Amino acid sequence: MEHSGTSEVTGADTAGPDPQLAVTMGFTGFGKKARTFDLEAMFEQTRRTAVERSRKTLEAREKEEEMNREKELRKQIEDMEPAPSSSSAARERSQSSCRDTSSSDSESDDSSDSSDDELIGPPLPPKMVGESVTTVDEGTLGPLPPPLCEEGEDDDDDELDDEGEEDNPVQRIPDSHEITLRHGTKTVSALGLDPSGARLVTGGYDYDVKFWDFAGMDASFKAFRSLQPCECHQIKSLQYSNTGDMILVVSGSSQAKVIDRDGFEVMECIKGDQYIVDMANTKGHTAMLHTDSWHPKIKGEFMTCSNDATVRLWEVENPKKQKSVFKPRTMQGKKVIPTTCTYSRDGNLVAAACQNGSIQIWDRNLTVHPKFHYKQAHDPGTDTSCVAFSYDGNVLASRGGDDTLKLWDVRQFNKPLFSASDLPTLFPMTDCCFSPDDKLIVTGTSVQRGCGSGKLVFLERRTFQRVYEIHITDASVVRCLWHPKLNQIMVGTGNGLAKVYYDPNKSQRGAKLCVVKTQRKAKQAETLTQDYIITPHALPMFREPRQRSTRKQLEKDRLDPLKSHKPEPPVAGPGRGGRVGTHGGTLSSYIVKNIALDKTDDSNPREAILRHAKAAEDNPYWVSPAYSKTQPKTMFAQVESDDEESKNEPEWKKRKI
C-alpha cells in the first residue's frame, strides 16, 4: 500500500465492502474508510499559535516597561521643575491617572482579546489610543470625566495615607476604643492570649485564674471559668503554648503546672531535694519560681527560673525530671538568682536577667558557659522584670527594676544601643514588648496609690524617643501584651482590671466580637402555683382551705410542734415515758451526786479520844497493865517554853537577827 507525502493514520483497508460478508452478517458497513489525521499540519498549527501568544506577551511586557520609563522620566522632570500651584498639580495628577487608566484599559482589552475568542471586533489601534490621550492632555479647559478622576484621586489619597502610616508608626496604635474586664480587687499579675486570639486568661494576687472567651462573651464582659490551680500561691505568669492547647502556670511555689484550655491539669513539675548543694543534681526547683517561657519551635518544651539560682528546661511528657539546667554565675563564680528568662525567636538562645544586674545568654545546647555575659546591664540589687526579643531576633529589650528600659544588639553585646529612664516600676513582673511591625517598644509605669495614674509608654525603636502615652487608670500598669494577629493591646493593672484597647478599622476579631452583642437579660424564675377550684356550694369536708398570707401560715406552723420541730421540755421530777429524770439522769449528775461530794471532817479528834477514856481506865488492856506496878501514877513530861530552848542552844546554833 502506497502512502502520500504527508503521514496519515488509517483505521481500515481502502478496499470496498464485501457483499458475501454483508449477506452472512445481516448488515452492511464493513470496509469503510476511517478518518485520517494530518499530524504534521496539527503540529504546525500548534507551533504558530504558541509563537503568536509569545509575541503578544512580549509586546505587552514592552509596553509596560515603556510606560514605567515614562513615569520615571515624568517624575524626575516634576522634581526638577518648581512646584506648581495646588490646582494645577491636582489637575496634572488627575490627567496622569486618567492616562494610566486608559492605558491599563487598552492593555486589559488586548489581553482579553487574546484570551477570549467570542468577543466581536478588534481592539482599538494604538494610534487612536495615542490621539485620545493627546486630546486629554491638550484639553485643559474642560473637566475630566467624573468616574475616572474620582477613582484616581481616591487611589492617590489611599497611597498617601499608607505612606503616612509607614512613616509614622504611631498611627498604627489601636487605642481608639477600649473594654474593661474585671478580674477582681487585687493586682492582675499575669496575662496570656492564645495564638489565634480567641481566648484570654488572667491571673492575679488573689490566686485566681480566669478564662475569657471573646466569641462567647456579651457586653457584660464576664469570665466563663474561674479556678485556683496553685491553691494559696500568687499567680506570677501565664503563657499559652504555640499550638494554643496548653497553658503554662507559674506561681509562688517551686512547682510549675501545665493545664489545658479548659483548666484541667495536664502535668506538674517535680520538686527537687533542697538538701543537695549542687542544684544540677536535683530533679526540680527547690525554691520559689519567677517566670516561664515556651519554646517557639519545639512543642512541649518550656523553661522556668527560680530562687534556687537555676534556669531549667522541661518537657511536658517527662514531669519527673528536668531536661537541662543552666546555672547563672557572677564574674567571681558565685551563685546569682535569675529573675526573668526567655527564648529567642528561633529558639536557639536562652536569655536570663539576674539580681546582680547582669544579663546572661546561653546557647540552648551548651549549658555550661554563657555565650554572652554583660555584668552591669542594670543596677545591682534590683529585679529585672522582663527581657524580650524583637521579631527579627537581632534586638533584646530589658525592663529593669532601676526604672529604666534598655535596648541591646545581640550581635554586638558589649553595650546598650539605647537607654530610657524615668519609667518607675514597683512590681517584679512589669512587662515590655515589641509592636507587630517591630518599630515600637511598649512598657508600663507604676505609681503609688493616690499619686497619679499608670501609663502605657510607646518608644520608637530607631531613636528610642517617647512618641505616645496612654493613661490607663489610677493604678500601676503591670502587664502589657500586643497581639500581632488581632492588633489589640491587653493591659493588666494593679487594681484588678484587665483592659483591651482596639481600633475597629485596624484590629481584627477579639474585642470586636463581644462589644456588638447585647447583654443577656436575667431569666425570671418560673413558679408553678396550685390551681384552686372554687365550689361555694360543696360540703365542708370537700372544701379546700383558702390561701393565706405567708406570715399567718408561719404563725400557724409555729404553734404545731411537729411542723416547727419544737424540742421536748425537760422532765420535772422522776423520769416517765422512757425518759430519765433531770436528777441523776446523766453520767455527770451521777458523778456529782456520788463522788464529787464535800467530805470534810469537822469533828474534834481530842473529844473522840476522850470519849473512850473512862472505859480504858476501868478496863485497861494494852498499856496500863505494863505500868501498874512500876508507875501506878501517870506522869507526863513538862512543857518547856521556846525561850528556854533558845537559851540552852550553843552560840553557833542561835539564829542571827
Swiss-Prot record:
Positions where Phosphothreonine occurs in the chain: T582
A UniProt-annotated Pfam family: WD40
Residues forming coiled coils: none
Region (Disordered) location: 1-21, 43-172, 543-584, 634-657
Keyword Ubl conjugation: yes
Repeat (WD) residue spans along the chain: 183-222, 230-271, 284-324, 333-372, 379-418, 424-469, 472-511
The protein's name in its UniProt record: WD repeat-containing protein 70
Organism annotation: Mus musculus
Gene that specifies this protein: Wdr70
